[in-house]
């Protein structure tokens, strides 16, 4: 039987990609060309960790929180379910109660609210804090969203971030889901082995189960 092909659900990183207002712009350049070195091109990359498709570590919002290197990589690999939650201003327990989520460990939410990697949104659907205990009761260990944050963009309390990790749920942001159907997939979204970082870019891919 032919194995299904992997589907990329990552935002391509290039010099046009949007970043959080005031954060470090993405930049890639060849800093040492083949003509200069005589053998190879060597690139230089400058970026914020929270550009494009990425994961958050607790250190992002808690000075005492775990850093990327301390996170369990098993969480970012395995079966995942994509569900559609379009046309909602916020998402919490109430909005998810009618979905069958028993046995789901990784949940990706399609809000279809923005979808423009080169434009930072003015407002996004956000997760309410009551989603965390609900997801935890279902056994979910990772939540993914197709927007830059699980909290409102102008929020300073970051209640969803705090409650999700308090309940053992990891955060994946800025996945691209408009080109894939609802259903069950195998997910790989591994962070880099960054020792002191508050997050990491990932190449997120899925394939149907």
From Swiss-Prot:
The enzyme's E.C. designation: 3.5.1.9
Reactions it catalyzes: N-formyl-L-kynurenine + H2O = L-kynurenine + formate + H(+)
Residues annotated to bind Zn(2+) 2: 56, 161, 173
Involved pathway(s): Amino-acid degradation; L-tryptophan degradation via kynurenine pathway; L-kynurenine from L-tryptophan: step 2/2
One GO BP annotation of this record: anthranilate metabolic process
Binding annotation for substrate: 20
GO molecular function, one term: formamidase activity
Cofactor(s) for this UniProt protein: Zn(2+)
Annotated Pfam families: Cyclase
Active site: 60 (proton donor/acceptor)
Binding-site residues for Zn(2+) 1, renumbered to this chain: 50, 54, 56, 173
Cofactor comment: Binds 2 zinc ions per subunit.
Transmembrane regions listed in the UniProt entry: none
Top-level taxon: Bacteria
Matches recorded under InterPro entries: KFase/CYL, KFase_sf, Kynurenine_formamidase_bac
Gene3D superfamilies, sorted: Putative cyclase
Enzyme class (EC, first level): hydrolase
Entry keywords, A to Z: Hydrolase, Metal-binding, Tryptophan catabolism, Zinc
Signal peptide: none
Subunit structure: Homodimer.
PANTHER family (UniProt xref): CYCLASE-LIKE PROTEIN 2 (PTHR31118), KYNURENINE FORMAMIDASE (PTHR31118:SF32)
Family: Belongs to the Cyclase 1 superfamily. KynB family.
Function according to Swiss-Prot or TrEMBL: Catalyzes the hydrolysis of N-formyl-L-kynurenine to L-kynurenine, the second step in the kynurenine pathway of tryptophan degradation.
Record's protein name: Kynurenine formamidase
Species of origin: Bacillus cereus (strain ZK / E33L)
Organism lineage: Bacteria, Bacillati, Bacillota, Bacilli, Bacillales
Protein's gene: kynB
């Amino acid at each position: 039987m032919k194995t299904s092909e992997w589907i990329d659900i990552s935002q391509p990183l290039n010099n046009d990609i949007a970043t959080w207002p005031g954060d470090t712009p993405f930049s890639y350049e060849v800093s040492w060309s083949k003509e200069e070195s005589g053998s190879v091109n060597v690139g230089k990359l400058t970026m914020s960790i929270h550009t494009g498709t990425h994961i958050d570590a607790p250190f992002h919002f808690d000075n005492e929180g775990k850093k990327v290197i301390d996170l369990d990589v098993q969480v970012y690999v395995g079966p995942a379910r994509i569900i559609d939650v379009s046309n909602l201003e916020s998402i919490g327990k109430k909005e998810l109660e009618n979905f069958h989520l028993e046995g789901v460990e990784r949940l990706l939410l399609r809000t279809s609210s923005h979808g423009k990697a080169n434009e930072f949104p003015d407002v996004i659907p956000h997760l309410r804090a009551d989603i965390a205990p609900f997801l935890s009761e279902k056994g979910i260990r990772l939540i993914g969203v197709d927007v830059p944050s699980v909290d409102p963009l102008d929020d300073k309390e970051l209640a969803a971030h705090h409650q999700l990790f308090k309940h053992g749920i990891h955060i994946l942001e800025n996945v691209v889901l408009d080109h894939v159907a609802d259903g069950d997939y195998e997910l790989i979204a591994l962070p880099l082995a960054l020792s002191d970082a508050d997050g990491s870019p990932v190449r997120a891919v899925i394939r149907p189960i």
